[in-house]
């Protein structure tokens, strides 16, 4: 049978319990039509890139589905009707990914990063130029902003300035 990755976004107003019930409902539809859910991941509430239906955040859920195309058509029909579902996307894949998805691996990596601690002390080199506290360099001698350039040299092709027209 074909393999599918299906992701849907539920409104942020919906509780975690409501999202779990929605996922259970979708799973029962899949199994009722002869398919099966190989993997289910809830990515939690995440920020959206842009507003969708007046929502800035949404519950993200991934389902790996093994079933006929009729299963996908019915799941998408059910999600179109349901007001809690903001968006959904189903992609046919050649093989399903083993282990945690990229989003779950990213969450683990972020959690590991937090364990290192936040502040790592003053950085070598001090001030970075675009931050408060002065400027320590640049690509010009003596460093600094444009004010350090010095006077301009006269142009080679400089012609005498035209005389102002006088009225007689």
From Swiss-Prot:
Matching CDD domains: bS6
Gene3D superfamilies, sorted: 3.30.70.60
Give the GO molecular function terms. small ribosomal subunit rRNA binding; structural constituent of ribosome
Q: Which SUPFAM superfamilies match?
A: Ribosomal protein S6
What are the entry keywords?
Ribonucleoprotein, Ribosomal protein, RNA-binding, rRNA-binding
Task: Note whether Zinc occurs among the keywords.
Answer: no
Q: Single Gene Ontology BP term? A: translation
InterPro entries named in the record = Ribosomal_bS6 (IPR000529), Ribosomal_bS6_sf (IPR035980), Ribosomal_S6_plastid/chlpt (IPR020814), Transl_elong_EF1B/ribsomal_bS6 (IPR014717)
A GO CC annotation recorded here is: cytosolic small ribosomal subunit
Q: What does this protein do?
A: Binds together with bS18 to 16S ribosomal RNA.
- Could you say which protein family the record assigns here? Belongs to the bacterial ribosomal protein bS6 family.
UniProt protein name: Small ribosomal subunit protein bS6
Organism for this UniProt entry: Rhodopseudomonas palustris (strain BisB18)
The organism's lineage is: Bacteria, Pseudomonadati, Pseudomonadota, Alphaproteobacteria, Hyphomicrobiales
């Amino acid at each position: 049978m074909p393999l599918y990755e299906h992701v849907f976004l539920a409104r942020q107003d919906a509780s975690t319990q409501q999202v779990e019930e929605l996922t259970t409902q979708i799973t029962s539809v899949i199994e009722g039509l002869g398919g099966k859910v190989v993997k289910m991941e809830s990515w939690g509430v995440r920020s959206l890139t842009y507003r969708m239906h007046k929502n800035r955040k949404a519950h993200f859920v991934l389902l790996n589905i093994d079933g006929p195309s009729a299963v996908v058509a019915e799941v998408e029909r059910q999600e179109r009707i349901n007001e809690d579902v903001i968006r959904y996307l189903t992609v046919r894949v050649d093989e399903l990914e083993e282990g945690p998805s990229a989003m779950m691996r990213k969450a683990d990596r972020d959690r590991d990063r937090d364990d290192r601690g936040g502040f790592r002390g003053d950085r070598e080199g001090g001030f970075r130029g675009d931050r408060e506290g002065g400027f320590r360099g640049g690509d010009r001698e003596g460093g600094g902003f444009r004010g350090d350039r010095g006077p301009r040299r006269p142009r080679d092709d400089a012609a005498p300035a035209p005389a102002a027209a006088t009225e007689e």
